Amino acid sequence: MKKILLSAVSLLLLVSCSNDETSSSTDLATTAHKHHRGCASHEVHEQQLRENPELAAKMQEIERFTENAITNGRLVNGRIEIPVVVNVLYRTAAENISLTQIQSQIDVLNKDFNGQNSDFNQVPTVFSGVKANVGITFVLDAVYRKSTTKSSWGTRDAMKKSKQGGINPTSPTTKLNLWVCTIGGGILGYAQFPGGSSATDGVVIDSRYLGTTGTATAPFNKGRTATHEVGHWMNLRHIWGDTTCGSDLVSDTPTHNTANYGIPAFPHYSTCSGNPIEMTMNYMDYTDDAGMYMFSNGQKSRMLAIFASGGSRNSFAQP
């Protein structure tokens, strides 16, 4: 069983994922890897800690609650249905994505979080015993659109603030807000972990990587950017723990050297202790959309814990 370690580095408030076709953005420096997902977690983490020194302690408390809820079996019972509010910010006609494209993303979330994705059965035998049907559903609640003169929004949450030209979140303690805009810097999307301000809570996805139709662009055109980011919103870490042979705070995922890109050939062995086969098809890795198609049971438990009584997202589980 993988040792689970809790550290300040692993407790990131915000995770920002990128398609590193460019080497930098106005907000975060990234390393160029053409057509690869990438992450500027370190820079964003430092910025959030500078702005909110109390954040680390708050997230450690959420982690303690999560561990206790899992250990004591205090997970939410029954199905959880999450209303999704989509906020579209557009400068061009292409950025003003269609309702069809938006609904295609909701459909992907429902399939991926319920083990109904067509590639779910591709999970290798070695991991078939831990692949999870999370049992969380998503319903499109509303779509708000706003024309803008901005060519890109960056990663400082401007798209979430009407005073900065964005759209304020709608009922963020009971509805998942999803902003769709051009982020810039090659960034695909980012999410706020449980514990952050409700004024900025939710997920941001670049319009070119949302859903499966319209402007969705390969190799990130199967809606898995949102699946990955909603995983972060539900308290999941990257599977490699954001450091070499790190911990994602989940016991049934193997220890990864680092992020995986593209669609790795199976089996792909880690050089970490024990040389485990890496779970490259996990939604919390960095493979192409076609290369990721499972959550683990341990990840399911982490997600369900935050919706339990006393959990940081319990308000979403109320009737």
Which functions belong to the PLM regions below?
Residues 1-4:
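Positively charged n-region of N-terminal signal peptides that target proteins for export
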Residues 6-9:
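Sec-dependent N-terminal signal peptides
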Residues 13-16:
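C-terminal motif of bacterial Sec signal peptides marking the signal peptidase cleavage site
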Residues 18-21:
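Bacterial signal peptide processing site
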Residues 23-26, 205, 256-319:
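Metalloprotease/metallohydrolase-associated module, dominated by Zn2+-dependent proteases
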Residues 25-172, 308:
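Propeptide-to-catalytic entry region of secreted or membrane-anchored zinc metalloproteases
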Residues 98-105, 222-226, 299-302, 312:
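Stable alpha-helical elements in mature extracytoplasmic
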Residues 107-267:
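Metzincin-family zinc-dependent endopeptidase catalytic domain
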